[in-house]
């Protein structure tokens, strides 16, 4: 008996929204608590800072880089099965990591397997919101983002409590049971009815291929379908954005990994050090939805890329404050300021990508974007660990974070401004060319041949059939002297047409 489909924007959609919030809190909020175990793991395995840093870097990198693989599973099995599969993998990885005898085993279990499972769960839960919510989609995404903030708030406090009572091995075993709640959230996600019925097409049989060539061809088609390498060649803004975000990611995750060890290095109590991460999460509960709603306002549409650069700049400057002092109350003020810039970055990072790339190319652009960001996440913590081993000073880690964030903000802001000026220059040249064409047409008669670029510009607003008039309203056949009195208005309207402005009433 077929299962009944749920209706979009129905009452069950809010239950799915709650499940999505829980899933995001369990998955995206988890990496922020890894810093609490940093010193404990370092002592357990007698490892350097760089070697210990590979654990959070692998976890975060796989969490972002496995996005295209998750998209394939969603297309094949659906969101419900993928969320539940992710919960099983994340749980299996944490349980296995509690029996690790060296860091290599920890990298594979708690790093790779758990990161893969968390990616499957969180990305599938976000995808299903687009089917369950149509009219209230913006509100649903804003509320779902609160789950991340709740996770950032609760994971550090729970981790500190379990670590004191059970040790890191017992804590990771409990975490394995907690991640099984993703399976419950996945079971709540029922199939939803869509307005578009799937089309059945009869495809011709594929040409015969050898098994090796067929596998390589299938992999190539899959990569081409989910990763937008062709957009890099044709969209300069996309290239600038990817380079800028990758450069900023080399510094952005460092405070979340090293803030707790840095506070303990300055003799801050362990409970208070764990509380710092929770302050960031609690502040984001209110700031992140507010930033998301403000970023969606039409008044900010043309300035979103500059606001994103400003948020990165503020994030880098706040890290300088953290590096200057390790006093607890100074760190509390740092966490509050860091939360403001962090919420702006989280609200704008994908919205700016939507502004730069056409929506029909957005899924492929997002796939390449997450993969390249994952590479940066993989490099960032070990690079900071090498710096820490060389200097034995945590302050240099925050100086390093500030350098990457501030330089990325200046690069993106300057590059976007230069691209905007270049585009405005092209539009001005087109307007001047249209002005010259109108002058020649008025002077020499309607039979004069237009230049190709002018024909392209004027084709956007063709002349109505049966009306043979110039842009300023005079009939083409009546070339009297009063045409020249209206010439300034004609030039103004021509420029407005070329630049895409609305004509004055």
From Swiss-Prot:
Keyword Transport: yes
Subcellular location: Cell membrane
Region Disordered: start-end pairs: 443-464
Transmembrane segments: 18-38, 54-74, 81-101, 111-131, 138-158, 172-192, 240-260, 275-295, 306-326, 330-350, 368-388, 397-417
Cytoplasmic compartment residues: 1-17, 75-80, 132-137, 193-239, 296-305, 351-367, 418-505
Expressing tissues: Highly expressed in kidney.
Bilayer topology annotation: Multi-pass membrane protein
Keywords attached to this entry: Cell membrane, Membrane, Symport, Transmembrane, Transmembrane helix, Transport
Xref: InterPro entries: MCT, MFS, MFS_dom, MFS_trans_sf, Proton-linked_MCT
Domain of life: Eukaryota
Residues in compartment: Extracellular: 39-53, 102-110, 159-171, 261-274, 327-329, 389-396
MF-aspect GO terms: monocarboxylic acid transmembrane transporter activity; symporter activity
Job description of the protein: Proton-linked monocarboxylate transporter. Catalyzes the rapid transport across the plasma membrane of many monocarboxylates such as lactate, pyruvate, branched-chain oxo acids derived from leucine, valine and isoleucine, and the ketone bodies acetoacetate, beta-hydroxybutyrate and acetate.
Protein family according to the UniProt entry: Belongs to the major facilitator superfamily. Monocarboxylate porter (TC 2.A.1.13) family.
Name of the protein in its database record: Monocarboxylate transporter 6
Gene field: SLC16A5
């Amino acid at each position: 008996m077929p299962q009944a489909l749920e209706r979009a924007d129905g009452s069950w959609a809010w239950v799915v929204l709650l499940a999505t919030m829980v899933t995001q809190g369990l998955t995206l909020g988890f990496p922020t608590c890894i810093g609490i175990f940093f010193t404990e793991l370092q002592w357990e395995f007698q490892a350097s800072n760089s070697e210990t840093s590979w654990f959070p870097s692998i976890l975060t990198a796989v969490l972002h880089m496995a996005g295209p693989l998750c998209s394939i599973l969603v297309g094949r099995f659906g969101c419900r099965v993928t969320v539940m599969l992710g919960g099983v993998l994340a749980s299996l990885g944490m349980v296995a990591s509690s029996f690790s005898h060296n860091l290599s085993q920890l990298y594979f279990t708690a790093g790779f397997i758990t990161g893969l499972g968390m990616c499957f769960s969180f990305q599938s839960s976000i995808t299903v919101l687009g089917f369950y919510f149509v009219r209230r989609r913006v509100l649903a995404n804003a509320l779902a983002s609160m789950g991340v903030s709740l996770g950032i708030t609760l994971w550090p406090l729970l981790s500190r409590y379990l670590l004191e009572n059970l040790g890191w091995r017992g804590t990771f075993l409990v975490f394995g049971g907690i991640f099984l709640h993703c399976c419950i959230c996945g079971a709540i996600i029922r199939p939803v009815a869509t307005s578009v019925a799937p089309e059945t097409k009869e495809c011709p049989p594929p040409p015969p291929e050898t098994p090796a060539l067929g596998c390589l061809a299938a992999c190539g088609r899959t990569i081409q379908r989910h990763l937008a390498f062709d957009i890099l060649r044709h969209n300069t803004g996309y290239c600038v954005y990817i380079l800028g975000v990758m450069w900023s990611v080399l510094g952005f995750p460092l405070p979340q990994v090293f803030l707790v060890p840095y506070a303990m290095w300055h003799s801050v109590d362990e409970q208070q050090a764990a509380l710092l991460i929770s302050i960031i999460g609690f502040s984001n509960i209110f700031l992140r939805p507010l930033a998301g709603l403000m970023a969606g306002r039409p008044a900010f549409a043309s300035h979103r890329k500059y606001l994103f650069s400003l948020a990165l700049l503020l994030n880098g400057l706040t890290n300088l404050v953290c590096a200057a002092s390790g006093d607890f109350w100074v760190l509390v003020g740092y966490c509050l300021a860091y939360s403001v810039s962090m919420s702006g970055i989280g609200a704008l990072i994908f919205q700016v990508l939507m502004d730069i790339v056409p929506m029909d190319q957005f899924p492929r652009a997002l796939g390449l974007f997450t993969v390249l960001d994952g590479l940066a996440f993989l490099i960032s913590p070990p690079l900071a660990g090498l710096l820490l081993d060389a200097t034995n000073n945590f302050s240099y880690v925050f100086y390093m974070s500030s350098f990457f964030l501030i330089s990325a903000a200046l690069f993106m802001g300057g590059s976007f401004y230069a691209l905007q000026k270049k585009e405005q220059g092209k539009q001005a040249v087109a307007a001047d060319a249209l002005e010259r064409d109108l002058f020649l047409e008025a002077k020499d008669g309607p039979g004069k041949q237009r230049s190709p670029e002018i024909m392209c510009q004027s084709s956007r607003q063709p002349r109505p059939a049966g009306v043979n008039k110039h842009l300023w309203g005079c009939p083409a056949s009546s070339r009297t002297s009063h045409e020249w009195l209206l010439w300034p208005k004609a030039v103004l309207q021509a420029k407005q047409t070329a630049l895409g402005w609305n004509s004055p009433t």
